[in-house]
């Protein structure tokens, strides 16, 4: 049986896309996943261009599999994702052993691109932006466990000065409303209990309705909430500018919507937010969070932060630290600023030293880590509804699951609980997870 190896970098959208690549090639050629490139007939790198030196990391990984191509000329090597979208044919020019280069919007054409490569003997490059076409050509998703991702829109039209996403994934394009609802209903009918709605700017969703007009994100959430079998709803990633009052009110009336929100802020300084072209102030962000917690008092908040953005002073950074403490963020994706080619900020003077950037990042992460541990400790003694995702990472005899507020819980229980909800009493708070005991453990083993 032919095998496919996919290495994925970056965001959950890329994780979703990698699953779809595997689905497409399984349907077309019967390829099944392997965890080792040495066993593969097709090797794909699904790349991310958000972080520094992303291109060099891709070529480094390509270099590590070049010998496999030399040993087996029939091996197909492909590069997809955002670096592929940025670099295009330049990838083949630098690494001539690459067979296919494709963007996030053309992954559905993989079987065709591979067939053309075999037929012509020439590398194939397709990094076009055919809007939402790919969703019409994807096979039904595989269901593994009780949770699934559903992509509802692609791209971003915000053009923050530091970000490459609008250039690599294109402008915002929403899937038709009925297509999203049909996919969610199909997943629920196949046993999926938790749905995560995905998009680069997911709350900017404006899906076309069959009867005319559009559905906004709040309406989509309300309709997903009504689908039988769906018991928990998440979404990522959102933008503060699209956090409408209707969406905020969903936290007061949709109990299936989890008590966790990832809402990127990037900085606590109005001056830096303006330089980033974020389109909101610190006060406006704080107002959004206040309104959200009026609707859902136990809402846990995570965010994205960039430290050392061009022009960031000590006062700017202290404003970020103040915001972190005021709003009690308890998780983050936080990074040192690095120039991304083709973005407006790449022309700014990168005037914060590497040493200072590192110091600031360490302070920020330590503060958020302390706040996260405070939340974890506050959960000890409570009973949490946990969706079992698999075996515990460090103990194969235990199960691991996730709470509504996005905490990992490890506890003893039989493997048949995979994909099921279990009530778990939290007994211990660890730095990055919780331990617990299933409330009805005596019945779980029968």
UniProtKB/Swiss-Prot annotation:
Enzyme class, UniProt record, top EC level: transferase
Annotated EC: 2.8.4.3
Keyword Iron: yes
Gene responsible for this protein: miaB
Domain TRAM: 377-440
Compartmental location: Cytoplasm
Natural source organism: Thiobacillus denitrificans (strain ATCC 25259 / T1)
Assembly mode: Monomer.
Main location: cytoplasm
Protein name from the UniProt record: tRNA-2-methylthio-N(6)-dimethylallyladenosine synthase
Binding site for [4Fe-4S] cluster 2: 156, 160, 163
Keywords from the UniProt entry: 4Fe-4S, Cytoplasm, Iron, Iron-sulfur, Metal-binding, S-adenosyl-L-methionine, Transferase, tRNA processing
Residue span, Radical SAM core domain: 142-376
Cofactor binding remark: Binds 2 [4Fe-4S] clusters. One cluster is coordinated with 3 cysteines and an exchangeable S-adenosyl-L-methionine.
